[in-house]
Amino acid sequence: MRIVLSRSAADYIRKEAAYLRGHSRAAGEAFVARVKAVRRDLTAFAEAGQLLPVPSVRRLIREGYRFDYRIRPDVIEIVAVSSSVNTPLDMPSDDPDFDYET
């Protein structure tokens, strides 16, 4: 199955690769290789990602990045890519030592 990127996903990938290359060429190349691996894996295992509450959207988390995608009849569309490392919690933590004062 063919994999396509939404405009916002493609923009994020370009910007993230440029940012990483600015700090380390190897890090930038590793990120691009990670994106290629996700595309290859989704071709073989389209339903690998977890279903999200958004209708027909799945999420695959790979090495610190979230890849949100939709499976269409003839194509898989990656609709969003984002870092999962520096993202605040969406809900309160289960950790009893969690500090609510941020």
Locate the predicted segments by residue.
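Basic, Lys/Arg-enriched alpha-helical interface segments
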Residues: 2-57, 72-75, 98-102
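Enrichment for repetitive, rod-forming helical segments
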Residues: 41, 65-66
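Short, charge-rich, low-complexity interaction segments located
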Residues: 46-55, 67, 86-91
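A beta-hairpin/wing motif
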Residues: 58-64
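Beta-strand-connecting loop/turn residues
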Residues: 64-65, 74
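Enriched for short, Lys/Arg-rich terminal
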Residues: 70-102
